[in-house]
Amino acid sequence: MMKPINSLTNVSSWSGFDEMSRLLSFAVLFTFSLTGRAQTDSTMVRNDSVTWNKSLEGVTVTAQRQLIRQDIDRIGYDVQGDEDSKTENVLDMLRKVPMVTIDGEDNILVKGNSNYKIYKNGHLDPSLSKNAREILKAMPASAVKRIEVITDPGAREDAEGVNAILNIVMMDTKKMAGVTGSLTGSYNSLRYPSLGAYLATQLGKAILSVDYGYNYMSKKATTTNGHVERTFVSTGNTEVVDSRGTNPGYVHYVDVNASYDIDTLNLLSASFGGYFYKVDVQGGSDVTMCDRGGNPLYHYADDYWMPDYYHHSWNGRLDYEHKTHRKDEKFTLSYMLALTRQHTEQETNYVDALDIPFNYTGFLLNSREHFTEHTFQADYVRPLWEGHKFEIGTKYIFRQNSSDNAQHFYDAASTTTSDLFDHTTQIAAAYADYIYHKGKWVARAGLRYEYSHMKGHYPDGKTADFGKHLSDWVPQASVKYQVDDRQSLKLAYTTSITRPGITYLNPAVYSYPASVQFGNAHLESAREQSILFTYMYVGQRLTLQLVPQFHFYHNALGSIVYAEGDTRYSTYGNVLKQHRFQMEGYVQWKPFNATTFVANITFTDNHANHNAAQLKQHLTSMYYYAYLSQKLPWKLTATAYTYGEVGHSPMNIYAYGRPWMRYAFMLQRSFLSDDRLTVRLMANAPFHKNLHYKTCTTQGDIIGWGDNINTQNNQFFRLSVSYRFGKLKASVKKTETTIENSDVVGGISKGK
């Protein structure tokens, strides 16, 4: 259980400046004398408390409830302690959570990236992980007790490639009267409607909650243009591509959770959810190849469309938890089923052709991919004696991937190519975690072992089958020291592994006029090791976190791009050696009662070596996010935020992204009793219509630059309305441990 940071009674809104002064003093002296400074700060806090108590006569005191709590492996934000939880949804509250950022399109990043999973009440919620922004937008913040960022997952999850876990802890009171929930709807100037509903009810010992949503993406909202120039080093020829595209369509999602209290010691919980989307993809491009002197060698235009493109993913989970009469001792059994199906049918025609280097006028591509996963897991937690706890568990995963790809070319011979590929993975794992807590010290150490067997099979017999056995030991350890009531220090060592998915493994060859791409069936799992040091200060008005860290790996999965003549070839390999230094910073400051400022900053210094291409890369970048909220008269709340990146962020060993910036403004007001009705107006980039994302390719067989332009969907105005009904007194209970799989890259996309 997380220990709350002690709070001090606040006399004046100007105490935030006092905290800033004390913090700056600490930062200067910290380098010279950590221990001495810790004792001085503790004394100063006690003296301040005494001074304030003596001067309180005749003064009205406004107490500030401490909203941020910390433990050895996580940081928690007290949603119920935030007055805004009465009128906002969970997605809004995430903007205030340390190390979490929300962009203008409501995409969620944790610790500056999308490599995370989302838990609900301590266990994985697959539907929530895949449709987070839609579900959390429909869920009222009043239904949530706190939000946790698990920064250092223990041995139970750590091997499976997740940088962080976002845990949504629901309200857990025992009784509920009737039905409670919320209805949400929004519409923006890009003709993009969105609807959502969250319902919860109790039937005897059973509690049920349902999330449902629908989004329609218009043609205007999905229009993009691009310009790319590629120079082939060996020939000196340059390819110029101007592209256009749009993908209007719709998506439905649902997430159902249920729990049943068998008795005070036994709990059964289940969930079912998923999403389905279908889009009408259309687009085209104009391609010109020029020689060194700029003279055209050939030219063509293409038009493509996908009359049948759909993707659906479904999952189910069942957990049984048994608690003993010993405090905090429990045993959990879990099963999870995940299904993903994807079908792509793309037709492409070439027109306005001049001296083209291929003999067909178009092609029809038909692709089907299936993914099925069964997971079984058992977990046991045993407190040994005061301050000591032991956790053990085991896990088995069986994955089946299959793909069927056929490509028919419109040429004189009506050539057809076909590739069938099946891939299975079996994983057996066991872990042990030990936690020690005494006084100001907390320590944690764990070890995980994973054995995996991968097998590739080609039903058409065109390629020989293959198999591979992998064994991985994954240690982790961390230690935390609470300097005083406000400050703490932590040192952590973590490792993780990542396995290739079917897209990376599938050797099927996809041929286009100027490019060829294929997978690599002989890829291995990759291992990353990290060392992190964390300093955290939690005060009444000011919260600060600094996390310098070092990451390194020697066989990471990476792209292999090369050229033969004027044709671009791409595949994958265990070819990257990388060393990365990062400095993560978070600050939350309340200089006045009605003002909140939040900032997340991540500085990255990245060194990479590509073994296959004998290339090196050194890039630095900084991602930033700043959020300012101001309460105004008449129940109005004004919010502004900006986010972006400066420097050069690596895309791969060959290319990097250029700086970019986004911003938005919001105005909100609540109506009716208990602020049940909330209306919000948002302006996203009102002064910039086009959204540019520029890239540069500076080494390898092909160099050049690109500019991807969202011509419409950067600038929009959105009106949102939400209505809460019923009185929330309970939420679906969940077992505190369950299944989470996140070790695959390059598979069928599961979304975020």
Label the model's feature ranges.
Residues 40-83, 103-105, 111-115, 150-152:
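Short, acidic, small-residue-rich periplasmic hinge/interaction motif at the N-terminus
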Residues 167-183, 222, 226, 240, 453-456, 481, 485-530, 550-566, ...:
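Surface-exposed extracellular loop regions of Gram-negative outer-membrane beta-barrel proteins
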Residues 364, 373-377, 419, 427, ...:
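Outer membrane beta-barrel strand-and-loop segments of large Gram-negative receptors
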Residues 68, 91-127:
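Extracytoplasmic beta-strand/coil segments of soluble accessory domains associated
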Residues 40, 44-46, 217-253, 259-261, ...:
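Flexible loop and strand-edge segments within Gram-negative outer membrane beta-barrel domains
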Residues 58, 90-93, 132-134, 149, ...:
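N-terminal periplasmic accessory domains that precede
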Residues 90, 96, 123-151:
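Short acidic/polar hinge/loop motifs at secondary-structure boundaries
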